Amino acid sequence: MEQLLHYVWKHKLFPLSPLHTTDHRQVEVIDPGLHNRNTGPDFFNAKIKIDGMLWVGNIEIHDKASDWYLHGHEKDERYDNVVLHVCGIIDLEARNSKGEPLTQMQLSIPENVLRHYQELLSIDQYPPCYQIIPALTRLSVHSWMSALQTERLSQKTEAIAERVKKCNGDWEYAYFVTLARNYGFGINGEAFEQWALSIPLHSVDHHRDDLFQIEAIFLGQAGLLELSTIPERYQKDALNDGYFSKLRNEYLYLQHKFSLAPIDYKLWRFLRLRPQNFPHIRISQLANLYFRRQASLSHLLEATTVKEVIGVLKTSVTPYWETHYTFGSESIRNEKHISPFSLNLLIINTVIPILFAYGRHRGEEKYCDRAFEFLEELKAENNHIVRMWQQCGLEVENAGDSQALIQLKKEYCDKKECLRCRIGYEYLKRK
């Protein structure tokens, strides 16, 4: 409950009068102070009046007064300028490192705030706060959605910055790895990232003009050219499959040449995966993209509109995969172009974060601005999270909105971070 006490104090969600210290002096809260999330007192530079006298200093908040000693504050000089010790329960007198007694005040959590908080924590299908969404002003919703959108983009930027470190500062390589990860479309994202990191692009570049060799390296590094990785019912046909044999022999030669180590085939997940999303198909599409030099960051940076980006990312499989989903099993011919739906997701999860991260890194605002422009122009995602919020009454007009709502669900609702949510705040302060 200490976290909730912090919240009640920060937002002054308590009756402003009468408030009294344990020795019956009247307290008036003018400014609750600046919330400190690091070590030290909980609130800095608060302004309070005690019996009419103004005090400026720090506030410490605990469930029980005895927590002061439990946390060792009586030995810590940083807590000597605490002007008020606010507690849910006062069970003893507390003193600072100088031996001076603290001014203490009991603060109860208002019944309505406690009730609403418990409702928020008992989330089932919908967060209970959805009831107040229709009553929120358009401005407050727009402001919160904008903040969530930026927060989500910043999180993705941090992930890309870490990827750039793994790639020794090579942004082209980091872009390829990010693109590959998102070709996994969630289920195989981690496997695709490990696969991309296993490919030494500087070496592969020597064979960039040969699509067959690129596909051999790409499929070989995925562990997909081993006979044991092919379903048993197709293995006999795969042995008689000339393309499989040629790819395998070419990979063995290139593996030796570049000392390549493939990833573990078991990383790939096939259960409940549509054949269109099989790693073989996605890797062939990436090989084609790489061969046409469309998988390069420099090429992407030249694209100034969504239409141009789509032109950069459009790809299909090599001829063999038009009639196959796996080795040794022929299927009806299908060119297997990457779908508009998948392109939309790739731009949202790859292109936009890369533009934003690269723009920040280089201090070039035009790329950051372009990222936000693309978010406003692209269609919203259509998934269970977005549909849930739409049913709750929130309007979803573009990809920026859907990204904001995914951030809200994953980082606030799922983690029970209602006290950091602006909708949660409106819900808690209701009577």
Task: Describe the predicted segments one by one.
Residues 403-431:
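Cysteine-cluster motifs in flexible loop/terminal segments that predominantly coordinate metals
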Residues 7-66, 79:
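N-terminal ordered "arm"
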Residues 1-7:
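N-terminal "leader" segments that precede or initiate the main folded domain
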Residues 80-82, 86-144:
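Compact, glycine/acidic-enriched structural inserts
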Residues 149-404, 417:
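Hydrophobic, aromatic-lined core segments that form the binding pocket/scaffold
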